[in-house]
Amino acid sequence: MANWSCQDALKMYNVPYWGAGFFNIDALGRVVVTPDKTRLDCKIALVDIIEQLRKQGYATPVLLRFPDIIKTRINALFGAFEQAIQSYGYKGRYQCVYPIKVNQQNQVIESVTRAFADKPALGLEAGSKPELLAVLSHHHDLGSVIVCNGYKDREYVRHALLGSLLGHHVYIVVEKPSELELILDEAARLNITPRIGVRARLASQGSGKWQASGGEKSKFGLNAAQILRLVERLREADKLDCLQLVHFHLGSQIANIRDIQGGIRECGRFYAELRHLGANIEVVDVGGGLGVDYEGSRSQSHCSANYNLREYANNVVWGIGDVCAEFDLPHPMIISESGRAITAHHAVLISNIVGMESQLPTSLPDAPDAEAPMLLQNMWDSWKELHEKEDPGLLEIFHDSVSDLADVHTQYTLGMLSLHQRAWAEDLHLNLCLKLKVMLDPVNRMHRNLQDELNEKLADKCFVNFSLFQSLPDAWGIDQIFPIMPLSGLDQQPTRRGVIMDITCDSDGMIKEYVDGVGIENSLPMPEMRNDETNYMGFFLVGAYQEILGDLHNLFGDTHSAEVCLNDNGEPVITNIIKGDNVDNLLRYVNIDTSVIRRDYQKLVAHPSLSEETRKALLEELEAGLQGYAYLEDE
């Protein structure tokens, strides 16, 4: 393409659609972030931040957090609901609750609580005893909302009730029938009036990777008959007024707004029926599900969403309000647990490219001699047809070449062809694929599948200094798509494509799908790598679930992390730098005693053939290894 510009790069990587206004490309071809949308002129080049961290001794990979993005997302969510409430004349208020399971890192929870400072009240959700204790410690404002989900034992219930004594509005949501007796027993023992919620198991179900969270066979919630028994038990105990919240959850990352509409309507009916049964329901908790458009396609794909914040809020507010109008009921407070939508955009993983392995042929093999096997002659004939025929059948030529190459491999295994002949055939096939790729017409639908196949086949292997299993576990576990792109050189037209490999010893350690301007591709367009500088790759929208789900495959642990904030002058300030795991820590995680390792080193270097100077140098080197970063480091 002539006159390549950064606008072309934005389109190629689909940045305007998945970036949500936070990410852009500057005139120098660098990826920049605008974390605070009230200060659009404050743009931060990601490579500049990484270079500053390197000077301070922090090598990549590094996870960068932008707290201002969390604040911006919370403001946008509140704004969408406030506008919907005003538009529909809704009399209740909206309460955003952050479920900390999405990202329990202390810096993230602190960023969320700071962002709530000017909001009506802070809301946090816990799904386990450890999460509840963390949530209680982060609440400083009286009247803050705490939602207690998940399976519960007596201790969990007791801690939740004690939260009420601290002045918080703690809703203990009954997920299974047996939990109600625990709540009633502990509340009576502590002489505390509980706020009880019930999770309704809806027939409505979302679609996608997380659809099992909803529907009649979901792991959580009470069915209609169980809810009726719960109401009768509370009435019998004279505690029906304690039932104040009804909750449902269709699943995380709901892509289709119609699924949300159906769930809201069904939950609204539960609200209406419970009110008519005498329950003092004041809150409808619509759970999570608010999607993030990871691929920027605004579609029903499982990594996208065919709606925005405003449409989501409109459907929730209108749907509940419509049920209230139909049955002449008061408008309840609305809670949403939109953790993914709050945190996904705020974190970017950045690491260096450590190697490129080209799959392109370096030269064209010579024509086979007259005595060469017929199979090799046939392959050469396909090559000549591609060049000499006026209108060659491109698909047929490719299929013939693939078939011939398969026969070459078979005959080589049987000893009928030599290693030189196999290498000749493979080189010729690669040359043919490269020529075909140039000749294919991307507008021709018949050519598109082959174009994709050739892009993948001819793509470079791009080795990046990170662990997929530690930093992007959902890309491996559930094939989630994350936007990925080089952080510089984007003012140049991409000349090649790459497939990203991590540095684990696992063939699954590779990214299989990439966001592209025309859809999802199996390789990533890349500019030429510069040999005179470090080339960085950015992995975007990794702020939800990835850190806590990451594992220690090959003993690659947590990366360095840092927060980047804007000061009053609009300049970036790097704060809260946390060192990633060193080797010593990682060995201890798997119960390897590093003191024993050090003692064994002492024994090994005590060999009489080693001088005292050599022994000292060896021990220093081994100790440096134990204290070093688990990832690849520049000397």
Curated annotation (Swiss-Prot):
Q: Which residues form the signal peptide?
A: none
Could you confirm whether the keyword Cell division appears in this record? no
Its catalytic activity? L-arginine + H(+) = agmatine + CO2
Q: Which cofactors are named for this entry? A: Mg(2+); pyridoxal 5'-phosphate
Molecular function in Gene Ontology: arginine decarboxylase activity; metal ion binding
Which keywords belong to this entry?
Decarboxylase, Lyase, Magnesium, Metal-binding, Polyamine biosynthesis, Pyridoxal phosphate, Spermidine biosynthesis
Question: What EC designation does it have?
Answer: 4.1.1.19
The broad enzyme category this protein falls into is lyase
Summarize where substrate binds, as residue positions: 284-294
Q: Which residues carry this modification: N6-(pyridoxal phosphate)lysine?
A: 101
The pathway is: Amine and polyamine biosynthesis; agmatine biosynthesis; agmatine from L-arginine: step 1/1
- What biological processes does GO assign it? arginine catabolic process; putrescine biosynthetic process from arginine; spermidine biosynthetic process
Q: Please give the function described in this protein's UniProt entry.
A: Catalyzes the biosynthesis of agmatine from arginine.
**Similarity comment:** Belongs to the Orn/Lys/Arg decarboxylase class-II family. SpeA subfamily.
- Protein name stated in the entry: Biosynthetic arginine decarboxylase
List the gene name. speA
